[in-house]
């Protein structure tokens, strides 16, 4: 392998249609984000908001999945991550559709005059406690800078009446998040519990909330089969993105 190829592999993740560099981002490209970006409902979406975009992964995945006239706003508090997201977008097929904003979502959201029919976030979920290696990683992983109640309130202010707000969380935290959302007037419309294999309990949950009441569709996704290869359902969900599927 050439040195340049090795650096690319260390510093980012190559998908079928785009490359995500993440060496200057606290949170790297991982299965959680890939699941959320591939799973979120995009039918009839006209405008998308990505809260805490990090490397820009979710914004890029949603750009691939939606029509060319759908604008995407991606908001990131950390300046280094936002700059890398801007670079990833600039080198992607969709630089004209994705706008990265270096800002605090709590300051940015009240200034908006349009609403979004898809809001997506891979939010922090740890309560402040054990220190992280860097302040940037602590910001990305802990709810001190954006607690879940505030996130739900911001999404409620920015969403259209029939829009969806989608998140991925650890199973137990997702259950608490769901209860908090219901208490605030949200309706759970989609839920997918994610397990590593058939023998294990779910460890992640994908959730889609809406201001509008309606039937809730729930299912379960297993990432790997008994042979340790990706399952048919996981492959079907993500094969538009993974390079070797």
From Swiss-Prot:
Its name, as the record gives it, is tRNA1(Val) (adenine(37)-N6)-methyltransferase
Chemical reaction(s) catalysed:
adenosine(37) in tRNA1(Val) + S-adenosyl-L-methionine = N(6)-methyladenosine(37) in tRNA1(Val) + S-adenosyl-L-homocysteine + H(+)
Report the subcellular localization.
Answer: Cytoplasm
From the broadest rank down, the organism's phylogenetic lineage runs: Bacteria, Pseudomonadati, Pseudomonadota, Gammaproteobacteria, Enterobacterales
CDD domains hit by this protein: AdoMet_MTases
HAMAP family documented for this protein? tRNA_methyltr_YfiC
GO MF term (any one)? tRNA (adenine-N6)-methyltransferase activity
UniProt keyword list: Cytoplasm, Methyltransferase, S-adenosyl-L-methionine, Transferase, tRNA processing
Write out the function statement from the record: Specifically methylates the adenine in position 37 of tRNA(1)(Val) (anticodon cmo5UAC).
Species of origin: Salmonella typhimurium (strain LT2 / SGSC1412 / ATCC 700720)
Q: Which InterPro entries match?
A: DNA_methylase_N6_adenine_CS, SAM-dependent_MTases_sf, Small_mtfrase_dom, tRNA_Adenine-N(6)_MTase, tRNA_adenine-N6_MeTrfase
What protein family is recorded? Belongs to the methyltransferase superfamily. tRNA (adenine-N(6)-)-methyltransferase family.
Supply the gene name: yfiC
Q: Name one GO biological process term.
A: tRNA processing
């Amino acid at each position: 392998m050439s040195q340049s190829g090795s650096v690319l592999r260390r510093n980012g993740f190559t998908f079928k249609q785009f490359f995500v560099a993440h060496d200057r981002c606290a949170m790297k490209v991982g299965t959680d984000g890939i699941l959320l970006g591939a799973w979120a409902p995009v039918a009839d979406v006209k405008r998308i908001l990505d809260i805490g975009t990090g490397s820009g992964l979710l914004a890029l995945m949603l750009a691939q999945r939606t029509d060319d006239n759908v604008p995407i706003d991606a908001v990131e508090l950390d300046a280094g991550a936002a700059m890398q997201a801007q670079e990833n977008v600039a080198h992607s097929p969709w630089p004209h559709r994705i706008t990265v904003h270096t800002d605090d979502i709590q300051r940015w959201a009240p200034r908006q005059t349009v609403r979004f029919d898809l809001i997506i976030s891979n939010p922090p979920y740890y309560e402040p406690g054990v220190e992280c290696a860097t302040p940037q990683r602590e910001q990305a992983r802990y709810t001190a800078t954006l607690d879940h109640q505030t996130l739900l309130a911001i999404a409620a202010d920015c969403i259209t009446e029939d829009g969806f707000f989608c998140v991925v969380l650890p199973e137990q935290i997702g259950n608490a998040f769901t209860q908090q959302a219901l208490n605030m007037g949200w309706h759970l419309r989609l839920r997918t519990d994610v397990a590593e294999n058939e023998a294990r309990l779910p460890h992640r949950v994908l959730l889609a909330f809406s201001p509008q009441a309606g039937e809730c569709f729930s299912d379960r996704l297993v990432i790997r089969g008994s042979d340790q290869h990706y399952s048919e359902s996981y492959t079907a969900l993500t094969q538009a993105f993974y390079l070797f599927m």
